[in-house]
From Swiss-Prot:
This is DNA polymerase II large subunit. PANTHER family: DNA POLYMERASE II LARGE SUBUNIT. One of its GO terms (biological process) is DNA-templated DNA replication. Possesses two activities: a DNA synthesis (polymerase) and an exonucleolytic activity that degrades single-stranded DNA in the 3'- to 5'-direction. Has a template-primer preference which is characteristic of a replicative DNA polymerase. The lineage of its organism: Archaea, Methanobacteriati, Methanobacteriota, Stenosarchaea group, Methanomicrobia. Its EC number is 2.7.7.7, 3.1.11.1. It comes from the Archaea. Keywords: DNA replication, DNA-binding, DNA-directed DNA polymerase, Exonuclease, Hydrolase, Multifunctional enzyme, Nuclease, Nucleotidyltransferase, Transferase. It comes from Methanocorpusculum labreanum (strain ATCC 43576 / DSM 4855 / Z). Belongs to the archaeal DNA polymerase II family. Heterodimer of a large subunit and a small subunit. Residues 567-587 are annotated as: Disordered. The keyword Cell membrane does not apply. InterPro entries: PolC_DP2, PolC_DP2_cat_dom, PolC_DP2_central_dom, PolC_DP2_N.
Length: 1141
């Protein structure tokens, strides 16, 4: 594979990252060699490229070299197929056909998913060669739930790879039985009812796929429900719904058929001609536009959640106005908003909040951009004012009566490329105006009009929203101004009249209300647009006025001015998930992966468990090797079985307590007690799965006391230490208590794989100012940031600096948490490993320059990164490449960071759950270098130019496809394999501060104490927004959230189980004794009346205060009747006369 093309400066940056990693690896390996951990070496393999990630993820030695060889001469999709030739040739040591097929399919899927997600390891359960009814063989691939993370394209191509390899092995095609075909149809529809897939093919399309697909797409059971028809089929192993199978057929082959067809054509594969029929018949009807242009789409309004407001209905007047551009913190599914908009909307849209949008995608992340327009509001005084700064928003917030326009939404060209959405007319703006002849920003309205005489369009600041008005409204306003208005010293006075006020608000003309008059201080363009002279007389143009399609064309004709639409295209939006910046915690939070069973109670307290165990009776150990007098301080728990290779001691610890040697896991058969050898999965004698677990009798009191001594703590001063109830990994390996004590001391928590993580919402950033990230210029210069984006020396905190792709800005809260993690790691090295401290940090700024590991949920590859700053926002800012390397965009996705040394020292595969999906969200490999060719392709569409040419804006007016206009735009894909792929990026819009705006969303504000408060606040905001229909919103909330919840809980109440809160045993019915049969504790209901009735009162409140349909009102009444019939009506207290005195 060709070497990465970089500038010398960027190569030096990469070398610095690798040097820091090498130093950390050396120290971590030295520490791990002491044998304290499950393995005496760092368990996170390092990979510098895609091929290396694939090999590290799957463990097939030699496959990386082959992938590099193939990718040098063909596309990745072709390489994913051709790698099958190497497996068929047994180049990597496979011996059976099943191994060849299994490894080839997993490798191709890893290649297609950038070697990042867990789908290749977890999404394929197994492959099998089975027999058709005619005696021939066919290939069956068993897909599991985690196949979802691969995406539809990789899912579909994995089937194509299976077909390619089975041909090489002379295995025939799958020949389905009729009842199997119908089973697929019914099962996929049932799975869609459970999980709501992205795309559901028609029944006949499913039949077409199954009849013609040469591979049997099978699957493991993933859901709780069983299929109702076509059960107990001979060649289908389960009656339970198989989610993985449904995903591959529907969202894979059904949705991605065109992409499969392209690859079939490239590889000249026969037997897939039926795809043409599938493609011609499965175009989703909802995707087809009725006519050129864009039309209102309310898909984003479905599934409304109570308390999360709607800000703009689809293409509604007063909604978000589309502005074309990319700010330095937008792109990759993130959109910019003026900070004033964020505050005026009651702080619901905090920085990092997700917003569901009408177009061009489904959702976006919210970030501030001060270069775009804010909201236009009516104040309680009657004044109409546009608010463009956060200071003004704070000043006028309490005076706002009505929000007439919620401002602009900045969307980049790349978003239209990524979503394959037609371009659409943007709001007229200064950067467009300048390219159409505007010489400079006008000082005032008179100068703006003088520019028009020179051939320019009217400047956007003086272009009103003419196209929002009808012809009749403009005629009415013109008559009123001509008849009753007066122009004095350049200021227009119009007598108060609600009808006049309404039209002025439609036009969004700023004005005040003074002494009975509407006062317009910038009246010239308004007067001309109304066809009036400077004496407010009707101009001659009125006499020859033709009919018009909209108010803008009428105003242009009356005024003679060149004007464009200030409204542009409105975009609907509602609040999605709130932002997040919080430590990752297990439920309940724990400090150490040490099992204590039920001894620690609900809190899993190890120190309490040690005290409780000291008073346990001998009965707890009856039948064990413990004799009378030995009971004190002991617990019996399930742990891994390990043996010291030197002295033979059997223990549960990773290090032998007798001789200090690292111990080995012991696997044995649970049935015949036969010992297994390393690498064996099943018993060589009886075939049962080998296990590495046993009932261990642990002297918890002694272990706890020894751990306290080892870390220099006393029982009286040590913090509460929390462990786990049990271990769920195959080896059931135990963490040393010392690690837990040090974590508890520093108030940090462990995740299931031994690491300490901090979760944040993802946001993109390509440039930053030192002043906004809380780091001094001197500190930044010390880590390599010596120049600003223009090449000048970095000397001032206000200069703009281009962010390196593997540098990140974490939240301030995260920085403070990582300081504690660093203190823990230093103490761990000193007190457990007997080595020198590594971090020596006291403040968050001390972390600048230190390396971290980024990891996204559902993936298995960490990304090496470096902390260079902090943001006040509850989010993490990083380069688009960094997010794409984790297969994430920034539409509300979140992931985590962990200090590099913590991950290297504490992560172990031995801690991971042995169940399906156990290796997801675990750093099975670490990517050291980001290559734009090897990250998620969405980032290739990020545009990086300082301004869009005029051709792009004119293309927007005619709804051109973005690919037709791409030749005029500089975006990442054009820079790949040049030094410009890493540096020299630019942006069209700037922002003062990437954290400016609300930091915490109102949705999570404790002032809103419950759902009722949240709904009232949501509807109160909706009442003040012109772009929202409050009655419709109330109905949507009831029908999509409140009613389904109440009805579902009412049904669950009658079917509920009962549970012992002490030992967690569940019962279908309460035992006759009323107590738990296992531990004697109380048995309690899991569903209560409050769960059922919690939304009833707020639903009745909404029905009373808003206009709902008869259907919804009746649903509320019927639900109340059902609740009353279940629980009985509340008793009404009879009052007498004395109660009123």
């Amino acid at each position: 594979m060709a070497e990465l093309v970089t500038s010398p400066a960027y190569r030096a940056y990469l070398d610095g990252l690798i040097a820091g990693l090498d130093r950390a690896m050396e120290i971590a390996n030295k520490a791990k060699s002491l044998g304290v951990d499950p393995r005496p070496y760092v368990e996170i393999p390092i990979a510098s490229d895609l091929a290396g990630r694939v090999e590290a993820l799957l463990g097939y030695k030699g496959v990386a070299a082959k992938i590099r060889e193939l990718e040098d001469r063909m596309s990745r999709e072709e390489a994913a197929l051709k790698i099958g030739d190497a497996f068929v040739g047994k180049e990597f040591g496979e011996s059976t056909r099943e191994d060849i097929l299994d490894h080839a399919i997993r490798t191709s899927m890893a290649l297609l998913t950038e070697g990042v997600v867990a789908a290749p390891t977890e999404g394929i359960g197994k492959v099998a060669v089975r027999r058709n009814d005619d005696g021939t063989e066919y290939l069956s691939i068993y897909y599991a739930g985690p196949i979802r993370s691969a995406g539809g394209t990789a899912q579909a191509l994995s089937v194509l790879v299976g077909d390619y390899v089975r041909r090489l092995l002379n295995i025939d095609r799958y020949k389905p039985r009729e009842e199997e075909i119908e089973r697929y149809v019914e099962e996929i529809k049932q799975y869609n009812n459970i999980q709501s897939m992205q795309y559901l093919p028609k029944d006949d399309d499913i039949r077409l796929i199954i009849r013609n697909c040469p591979i049997c797409i099978d699957g493991e059971p993933t859901e709780q429900e069983e299929i109702s028809g076509y059960r107990n089929l001979e060649r289908v192993e389960t009656n339970v719904v198989r989610g993985g199978m449904g995903l591959v057929i529907a969202e894979g082959i059904g949705l991605k058929a065109p992409k499969i067809q392209k690859n079939v054509a490239k590889m000249n594969l026969d037997g897939w001609e039926w795809l043409e029929e599938l493609i011609s018949g499965n175009t989703p009807a909802q995707e087809v536009e009725e006519e050129p242009g864009v039309h209102p789409k309310d898909k984003y309004m479905r599934d409304m959640l109570a308390g999360r407001p709607s800000f703009s209905y689809p293409m509604r007047k007063g909604g978000f106005r589309f502005r074309l551009g990319r700010c330095r913190n937008t792109g990759l599914a993130t959109c910019g908003f003026n900070p004033a908009t964020l505050h005026i909307l009651d702080d619901y849209l905090a920085v990092g909040t997700q917003m569901k949008v009408e177009r061009p995608g489904k959702a976006c992340g919210v970030v501030p951009c001060t270069d775009i327009e804010g909201p236009t509001v009516r104040l309680k005084s009657g004044e109409l004012r546009r608010i463009d700064t956060l200071d003004d928003a704070n000043k006028y917030y309490d005076q706002v009566e009505y929000i007439l326009d919620i401002g602009e939404i900045l969307i980049s060209f790349g978003e239209f490329m990524e979503n394959n959405h037609v371009l659409m007319p943007p709001s007229y703006c200064e950067e467009w105006w300048i390219q159409e002849g505007g010489p400079r920003h006008p000082k005032n309205e008179a100068e703006a009009l003088s520019f028009v005489l020179e051939g320019a369009y009217l400047h956007p600041d003086y272009t009103w929203f003419w196209d929002d008005c009808s012809e009749g409204q403009l005629i009415f306003l013109s008559d009123k101004v001509a008849g009753t208005g007066s122009l004095r010293e350049g200021v227009l006075y119009i007598p108060e009249d609600p009808a006049v006020k309404s039209v002025l608000e439609e036009l969004l003309v700023p004005h005040t209300v003074e002494e009975g008059f509407y006062v317009v201080r910038t009246p010239l363009a308004l007067i001309m647009g109304l066809g009036l002279t400077d004496t407010l007389a009707k101009s001659p143009t009125w006499k020859t006025l033709p009919p018009f399609s909209n108010g803008l064309s009428m105003a242009i004709s009356l005024s003679g001015l060149k004007m464009r639409s200030k409204a542009g295209t409105r975009v609907g939006g509602r609040m999605g998930r709130p932002g997040k910046s919080a430590p990752r915690k297990m439920k309940p939070p724990v400090h150490v992966l040490f099992p204590i069973g039920e001894s620690g109670g609900m809190k899993r307290s190890i120190d309490n468990a040690a005290k409780i165990c000291s008073s346990d009776s001998e009965e707890n150990f009856r039948g064990t090797s413990v004799t009378t007098g030995q009971v004190e301080g002991l617990i019996q728990v399930q742990t891994g079985e390990r043996r010291c290779p030197k002295c033979g001691t059997v223990t549960f610890k990773s290090r032998c307590a007798d001789c200090g040697t690292h111990t080995d896991a012991v696997y044995r058969c649970p049935h015949c007690n036969q010992l297994g050898e390393e690498g064996q999965e099943s018993c060589p004698k009886c075939g049962a799965n080998l296990v590495c677990s046993k009932e261990s009798i642990v002297s918890l009191g002694q272990e706890y006391a020894a751990a306290l001594k080892n870390v220099g703590m006393s029982a009286s001063s040590s913090p509460e230490l929390k462990g786990v109830r049990g271990l769920i990994s195959r080896e059931r390996v135990v963490e040393p208590l010392e690690k837990g004590l040090l974590r508890a001391k520093n108030n940090i928590f462990v995740f299931r794989d031994g690491t300490i993580r901090y979760d944040m919402i993802d946001l993109p950033l390509t440039h930053f100012r030192p002043a906004e990230v809380g780091v001094s210029v001197e500190k930044l210069r010390s880590i390599g940031y010596t120049q600003d984006m223009h090449g000048a020396d970095l000397t001032d905190a206000s200069q703009l600096v281009e962010l390196h792709p593997q540098d990140i800005m974490v939240s301030v809260d995260c920085g403070e948490y990582l300081v504690r993690v660093a203190a823990y790691v230093d103490e761990l090295l000193e007190k457990v490993y007997g080595m020198e401290a590594f971090y020596h940090v006291k403040t968050p700024e001390d972390l600048v320059g230190h390396l971290v590991m980024g990891l996204a949920p559902h993936t298995s590859a960490g990304v090496l990164a470096r902390i260079v700053g902090f943001t006040k926002a509850k989010a993490g800012y990083a380069h688009p490449y960094y997010h794409a390397a984790k297969r994430r965009n920034c539409d509300g996705d979140e992931d985590c960071v962990m200090l590099l040394m913590d991950g290297l020292l504490n992560f172990s595969r031995s801690f991971l759950p042995s169940t399906r999906g156990g290796t997801m969200d675990a750093p099975l490999v670490l990517t050291t270098t980001l290559n734009p060719k090897e990250v998620d392709k969405e980032t290739l569409n990020v545009d990086v130019m300082p301004r869009y040419p005029l051709e792009v804006y004119t293309a927007c007016l005619t709804y051109r496809a973005p690919k037709e206009v791409g030749k005029f735009v500089d975006y990442v894909e054009k820079r790949v394999e040049t030094p410009g792929q890493f540096e020299g990026f630019s942006f069209t819009h700037d922002t003062t501060d990437i954290s400016e705006g609300p930091i915490d969303t109102m949705y999570t504000n404790p002032i809103l104490k419950g759902t009722a408060d949240k709904i009232k606040a949501e509807l109160g905001l909706a009442d003040r927004i012109r772009a929202v229909d409050t009655n419709d919103l109330a109905e949507r909330i009831i029908n999509s959230h409140l009613m389904p919840d109440m009805i579902g809980n009412l049904r669950s109440f009658s079917k509920q189980a009962f549970r012992c809160p002490k030992c967690k045993t569940s019962y279908r019915r309460i035992p006759v004794s009323g107590k738990c049969n296992k531990c004697g504790g109380p048995v309690k209901a899991t569903m209560h009346k409050g769960n059922v009735t919690k939304y009833l009162e707020i639903s009745k409140y909404m029905a009373e205060h808003y206009t709902l349909s008869d259907y919804t009102n009746q649903r509320i009444q019927v639900t109340e009747m059902n609740i009353n019939s279940t629980f009985g009506e509340e008793e009404k207290v009879q009052m007498d006369l004395s109660d009123f005195f």
